[in-house]
Amino acid sequence: MRDPVTDFEYPAAWVAACRSPDLLDDVRRGLAVLTASGTVLRRGFSTGTTAAAACKAAILSLACDTVREVDVTLPCGIAVRLAVDGYRGQASCRKDAGDYTADVTGGLEFVAMAAPSLSGGVQFVPGEGIGSFARDTPRHRRGTPAISAPALDCIRRSIDEAVEEADLSGTTVILTIPRGAEVAQKTLNPRVGVHGGISVLGTTGFVEPWDDHMTEGVIDRIARAPGAVVLTTGRLGLRYSRLLFPEHEAILVGNKLEEALRAVEGDAVICGLPGLILKFMNPDVLSGTGCVTVEELSATPLWEETVRRELAAFRARYPRVRVVIVDRDGRIIGEPP
């Protein structure tokens, strides 16, 4: 059995340990994950997926009064159906956190308002409750809505599908998150330079149920690896780890690097984007730099020396761990000599 989201082949022992075989269909479809103990945990939906569903429902409700559910194709390519409440151009969708109990945005309501555009064309307007960048960064200008590229693509695709289905020449859609500013205070946004609301994100469109069960799964995967392992923190890192280290077993560990390293016997590689890796190597890496994020630091003259210093210090502490830092295009930007 293979996870269509991560391409991970579940060991037969995990499948045999599952006491709820009826739930395995959700695992096959990517809607849930299977852990080493046989427990099935539901994936949740990202803020980007929730936003896309609300926008699509608002447009569809212009043509059919009420809308109770919509289909959304996620950035990972999987089509899902979400419950919505749409009526005459306004719709809401509540964020489903799945079995990720620590998701502070779980249950948050996303509201979209749509109106036909007489002049044609499609306009998407991020409104109240969606955060914006308080400072310029290498990828975002000050004041830009905090909506990631995969999430924005998902939203725009859902809007285009709804416009076609509703037979409209165009539309204007305004998306708001009524409690976004309040809930954002419980997230990392205030510390990473995003103000006024939450971020709308979603690399795959799902939220992983990262909890103690997932840690158990990571450790089990490391123990079962037939050879050397490469540990990575995210989806892009997983992709580039497989390309750079095809002979290694690539294992997605999220923010569980410390636990994963303890489970590794022998040599290991850490490969991925700089954010989590540098802060794992040195939680105070930003101290005294005047930067609030690693991405912001990467655009300063301090960057190259900081990367060299932190890699050397980490190598001295963990001589059997090789760290390879890549950018979003897969180029190696940091590696010990």
UniProtKB/Swiss-Prot annotation:
Keyword Cell cycle part of the UniProt annotation: no
Top-level taxonomic group: Archaea
Keywords attached to this entry: Cobalamin biosynthesis, Methyltransferase, S-adenosyl-L-methionine, Transferase
Pathway listed: Cofactor biosynthesis; adenosylcobalamin biosynthesis; cob(II)yrinate a,c-diamide from sirohydrochlorin (anaerobic route): step 6/10
Molecular function terms, GO-annotated: cobalt-precorrin-5B C1-methyltransferase activity
UniProt-listed GO biological process terms: anaerobic cobalamin biosynthetic process; methylation
InterPro entries: CbiD, CbiD_sf
Alphabetized Pfam families for the sequence: CbiD
Reaction it catalyzes: Co-precorrin-5B + S-adenosyl-L-methionine = Co-precorrin-6A + S-adenosyl-L-homocysteine
Enzyme Commission code(s) on record: 2.1.1.195
Keyword Ribonucleoprotein: no
Stated family: Belongs to the CbiD family.
NCBIfam families assigned: PRK00075.2-5
PANTHER family hit by this protein: COBALT-PRECORRIN-5B C(1)-METHYLTRANSFERASE
Protein name stated in the entry: Cobalt-precorrin-5B C(1)-methyltransferase
Organism annotation: Methanoculleus marisnigri (strain ATCC 35101 / DSM 1498 / JR1)
